[in-house]
């Protein structure tokens, strides 16, 4: 069997990524289909990356500065947590990865996709996800969920305009190829979990992983 499997969960704020992962973690807290499972998040995942996360969530800054900090956090995350876990043949599931930087800083904050991709090239290296799952929902659902959780931060504020939300949603949709990147229906959170389990099971048992 190859060394580990790297899975990223993506989508706009309010789509239900974190709820999905918490539900999955409750059902499969330590392993899934024979893989020991490591759960993490971005920004964050290591002590230093979590300190950078606090800055990103609560300190106003220039969009380019924000892009650099995301890349710095990701460098620590990849090298200190993700790569070692993959070398130990674990299943690594991360709440957000590089696609979020492309969407938020590259598109919405207009730093530019090429600029953000260049910043993250060294941070990520060859450690791109084997599979990415994009949790999708409509604008009203996302807003209602963010309002109910009542934990406002600077990143949440980015997608409270429908035009920006639509831009991000369209970008995420453009990534879907149903081979490495899959779309999950986040409107129904119970159904989303079952869809994720079924699709992830298919991904982990395909011949290319053996």
UniProtKB/Swiss-Prot annotation:
Sorted UniProt keywords: ATP-binding, Kinase, Nucleotide biosynthesis, Nucleotide-binding, Transferase
EC number, as in UniProt: 2.7.4.9
Domain of life: Bacteria
Pfam families assigned to the protein according to its UniProt record, in alphabetical order: Thymidylate_kin
Binding site for ATP: 11-18
Enzymatic reactions: dTMP + ATP = dTDP + ADP
Function summary: Phosphorylation of dTMP to form dTDP in both de novo and salvage pathways of dTTP synthesis.
Protein name per UniProt: Thymidylate kinase
UniProt source species: Mycoplasma pneumoniae (strain ATCC 29342 / M129 / Subtype 1)
Lineage: Bacteria, Bacillati, Mycoplasmatota, Mycoplasmoidales, Mycoplasmoidaceae
């Amino acid at each position: 069997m190859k060394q580990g499997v790297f899975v990223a969960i993506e989508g706009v704020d309010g789509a239900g990524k974190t709820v999905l992962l918490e539900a999955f973690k409750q059902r499969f807290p330590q392993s899934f289909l024979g893989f020991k499972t490591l759960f993490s998040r971005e920004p964050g995942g290591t002590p230093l990356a979590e300190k950078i996360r606090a800055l990103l969530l609560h300190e106003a800054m220039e969009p380019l500065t924000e892009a650099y900090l995301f890349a710095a956090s990701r460098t620590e995350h990849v090298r200190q947590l993700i790569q070692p876990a993959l070398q130990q043949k674990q299943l690594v599931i991360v709440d957000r990865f590089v696609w979020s930087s492309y969407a938020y800083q590259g598109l919405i904050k207009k730093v530019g996709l090429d600029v953000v991709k260049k910043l993250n090239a060294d941070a990520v290296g060859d450690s791109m996800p084997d599979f990415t799952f994009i949790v999708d929902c409509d604008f009203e659902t996302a807003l209602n969920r963010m309002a109910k959780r009542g934990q406002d931060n600077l990143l949440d504020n980015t997608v409270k305009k429908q035009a920006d939300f639509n831009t991000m949603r369209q970008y995420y949709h453009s990534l879907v190829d149903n081979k490495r990147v899959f779309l999950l229906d986040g409107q129904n959170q119970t159904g989303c979990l079952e869809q994720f389990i079924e699709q992830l099971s298919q991904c982990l048992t395909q011949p290319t992983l053996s």
